[in-house]
Amino acid sequence: MPIIQVNMLEGRTTEQKRSLAKGLTDAAVQALGVNAQSVRILIHELEPEHFAIAGVTAGEKPLANGNGGAR
């Protein structure tokens, strides 16, 4: 039973998270040859103040890649 954990900044829509879960499930089925019913996806949403690069939190300076989680 594959368990896939995703950590990402909060702010994405329910539809985006559902799409991500579906895509990851499909990828696991194809790559690992498992049944889709056995795939578990855990999405952990992080507050911007709980994610930092080089000591600067995403709340202080939004990430430059347009991550969708910046406020």
What are these regions (language model features)?
Residues 2-71:
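A domain-level signal for the structural core that forms small-molecule/cofactor-binding pockets
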